[in-house]
Amino acid sequence: MLETPKVLLKNLQDCKIHFIGIGGIGISGLAKYLKAQGATISGSDIAISPSVKYLKALGVEINIPHDPKAINNQDVIIHSAIIKEDNKEIQRAKELEIPILSRKDALYSILKDKRVFSVCGAHGKSSITAMLSAICPSFGAIIGAHSKEFDSNVRESANDSLVFEADESDSSFLFSNPYAAIVPNTEPEHLEHYGHDLERFFFAYEYFLDHAQKRVIYKEDPFLKNYSKNAIVLEKKDIYNIQYILKDGEPYTSFELKDLGAFLVWGLGEHNATNASLAILSALDELHLEEIRNNLLNFKGIKKRFDILQKNALILIDDYAHHPTEISATLKSARIYANLLNTQEKIIVIWQAHKYSRLMDNLEEFKKCFSEHCDRLIILPVYSASEVKRDIDLKAHFKHYNPTFIDRVRKKGDFLELLVNDNVVETIEKGFVIGFGAGDITYQLRGEM
């Protein structure tokens, strides 16, 4: 059983909450949500980010970088998982005896009275959460990415029902109070949090599912296919007549689901149809079928997921994929998109590995995942995400792709410049380029750094 956090948030209208690491997508979502609930929010981070700018525009006082002077009369401190005990603001809060909560513990208070549609899995959870949010427009939403439908990762609502993207990386999904547990897959990742113990990892998913009133699962997953308790089940054979089209220049997937008829969803690929199907099945008890079918059309994608930045002489796509399974699936979508556009351009991949631990844990899979639909591979330095640097010979491991190694990429007008030692070594003026990574590659591709 989970231990209930000793500190609970209540009377939000009178509550002063300080977030350490407020620029992160998960923490910024909670900050926006609690501000809308009436709490007084402040925060800090190590650098300016789009989330920090957004919150500042809402009137949130944010210190860059962390500053112990920012800790004074707050009622509670909430910090992201990456913040360590020796953080100056954490130390100051302890001196002042201000209660300190991790994001994981804070979730219990925030969600305990909500009817939560909690989406968790290794891949696809942001898309499913955003799709379900589009299908159920009266529900609140907290997503780990920006929905293009409402241009935010948070949608406030007076409705008790909330669509929530849960996180397995720190086991915080176990604190999400799921009314409905929606799980597309359980591919092992973040095993360092689970002591590299697969039994412990899968037990967490089982606990998550067991404690929901409603369960929606994709039974092609090796773990989920053996889940024995009552659940709404999706299988690969339930999705058929998949077709890909351009509608007003935008990519869409058309498919039929079980005996429910045809659906149309933004995006490309079988995985896109699977994600949409799980969202649809999750909403069948909430809305009439035709409402679900029509509302799904409001989904316009999410930022950094097959995010088409431009489509002229240079087609440029930014994608968050940072795991081999995700990269392989998205490359298939890229090839489909190229075919729909009738372009003969080769697909150029710019890849920024995210975390040394993930790269090392999945190295053999990474070495294979570019083998299809990637005509040229360009490799950026590993984005460490605060991990200690490890020695790894990427040139040796990826030599079979004859890759180009660069220090960074820079957007210059409609072109991309490849740089080594701050010198431009190549300019890409036309073609089909897709960038992969969960680090700062997204800002490089957008010309924001």
Curated annotation (Swiss-Prot):
One Gene Ontology cellular component annotation held by this UniProt entry: cytoplasm
Pfam families attached to this UniProt entry: Mur_ligase, Mur_ligase_C, Mur_ligase_M
Catalytic activity: UDP-N-acetyl-alpha-D-muramate + L-alanine + ATP = UDP-N-acetyl-alpha-D-muramoyl-L-alanine + ADP + phosphate + H(+)
Subcellular location: Cytoplasm
EC number: 6.3.2.8
Pathway: Cell wall biogenesis; peptidoglycan biosynthesis
Binding locations of ATP: G121, A122, H123, G124, K125, S126, S127
Protein role: Cell wall formation.
UniProt xrefs under PANTHER family: UDP-N-ACETYLMURAMATE--L-ALANINE LIGASE, UDP-N-ACETYLMURAMATE--L-ALANINE LIGASE-RELATED
Annotated protein name in UniProt: UDP-N-acetylmuramate--L-alanine ligase
Organism, as annotated: Helicobacter pylori (strain ATCC 700392 / 26695) (Campylobacter pylori)
